[in-house]
Regions:
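Charge-biased, low-complexity intrinsically disordered regions
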Residues: 1-94, 101-182
Length: 182
């Protein structure tokens, strides 16, 4: 079994207190509105992010948050139309983007910054690389997910883990062990 990393990679970032201090909230909200407006009119996301980020003098981490939170009105409507409540999952097969869900939950459990995006989805600022590191929050995160899916009475859960990411096989076995124990 691979040992948990003692560092909280997906926990609070040293720059978060400054980058997301209360004085920045209205600035970031205005930036999200501007970027969303540009995206809704078909402008390039990369060029629009640079334009809006420069206009508001945003730092790299703030730009990353802006990119994760902004969405056109149409994209928001499409995503909200696909949203399901836990009761909708009963007797259904659920497909889980394993790293995406797990990293966000690990960030939350590690005290990392979570953002409520314009489409109503919670997002974190964790980045996935070619190497996955198990954290102290990994086991509790998987247990919470297993508990949620069990309470939602899903008929089957299919986890997708990117094969090129190192430790995917170990993470798969850990998930299987936890789910089998329920």
């Amino acid at each position: 079994m691979f040992m948990p990393d003692t560092r909280n990679w997906r926990g609070p970032h040293p720059k978060d207190l400054e980058c997301f201090a209360p004085r920045w909230v209205p600035v970031l909200q205005a930036a999200v509105a501007d970027l969303s407006w540009l995206l809704g009119r078909g402008y390039s996301s990369r060029a629009s992010l640079k334009l809006v980020g420069d206009r508001y003098s945003l730092r790299d981490r703030q730009r990353k948050a802006l990119q994760r939170c902004a969405a056109s009105d149409d994209a928001c409507l499409e995503r909200r139309a696909k949203r399901l409540s836990p009761s909708d999952l009963e007797d259904r097969t659920v497909v889980v983007d394993g790293y995406n869900v797990l990293l966000t939950l690990e960030a939350a459990l590690s005290g990392g910054l979570l953002l409520l995006a314009r489409d109503g989805v919670m997002r974190d600022l964790s980045a996935m690389s070619a190497h996955y590191r198990r954290l102290r929050a990994t086991l509790p995160a998987i247990e919470l997910l297993a508990e949620f899916f069990a309470s939602a009475r899903c008929s089957q859960i299919i986890w997708y883990l990117d094969r090129p990411v190192s430790n995917s096989g170990r993470l798969k076995r850990l998930i299987q062990e936890i789910v089998a124990g329920r």
